[in-house]
Design a protein with these regions (language model features):
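Membrane engagement elements in two modes
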Residues: 1-58
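Beta-sheet-dominated interaction scaffolds and their linkers
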Residues: 46-79
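Mid-length scaffold segments of soluble, non-membrane domains
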Residues: 66-106
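Terminal connector regions
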Residues: 89-106, 110-113, 136-167
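Buried hydrophobic-core signal for structured, non-transmembrane domains
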Residues: 79-82, 130, 152-154
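Intrinsically disordered, low-complexity Pro/Gly/Ser/Thr-rich segments with frequent PxxP/GP/PP motifs
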Residues: 68-69, 73-74, 85, 111-138
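Short coil/turn motifs at beta-sheet boundaries
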Residues: 40-42, 71-73, 123, 145-147
Length: 167
């Protein structure tokens, strides 16, 4: 083989090799990555945050943000502003509910002010938080996979009256 033919042959092999590499990269990007993305990510869920305080407790209680967007599988912290409006120290306890109900088994409260009674001094203001995790399986369950918006509600009650079943 003469030198010119060897050069053309090497050039041809390099072009074939680069073409195959580009083709494999294209297949990887357009097939493997798209399929992988559709299985590992999910659409965010909107949480509408509602609060109320039973008339037996003279507190103000509001979410810092009334609506937040969360991604299933990510730990989320939600903050609430609370204030004792009375001139005496008072204790309250919160109950937690959500709608739609079938979503509840997919919410894990990792830390919550609602686990214990909370006491505020007269006119004291504070920030309470809840740390929660929405199980990514929520996007795969037939009863919940189409839910894109959830309402979470906390109601604060006077702790003593709540404990004594007087509410």
């Amino acid at each position: 083989m003469n030198t010119t033919i060897k050069k053309y042959y090497k050039t041809f092999l390099i072009i074939i090799f680069l073409t195959i590499c580009c083709f494999l990269f294209y297949i990887y990007e357009n097939k493997f990555r798209q399929n992988n993305k559709s299985h590992t990510t999910s659409e965010p869920i909107v949480l509408n945050l509602l609060t109320s305080v039973h008339p037996s407790l003279s507190w103000s209680f509001k979410p810092v943000k009334s609506k937040i967007i969360v991604n299933p599988g990510e730990v989320t912290s939600i903050e609430y502003m609370v204030e004792n409006l009375s001139n005496k120290a008072t204790s309250g306890i919160a109950t937690f509910s959500y709608y739609p109900k079938q979503f509840g088994s997919f919410i894990s409260k990792l830390n919550c002010f609602c686990y214990d009674a909370q006491t505020l001094k007269p006119k004291q203001k504070d920030i309470y938080s809840i740390v929660l995790l929405i199980d990514p399986e929520v996007t795969k369950d037939s009863k919940t996979k189409n839910i894109k918006e959830v309402t979470i509600q906390f109601i604060f009650f006077d702790y003593k009256k709540f404990k004594d079943n007087k509410i």
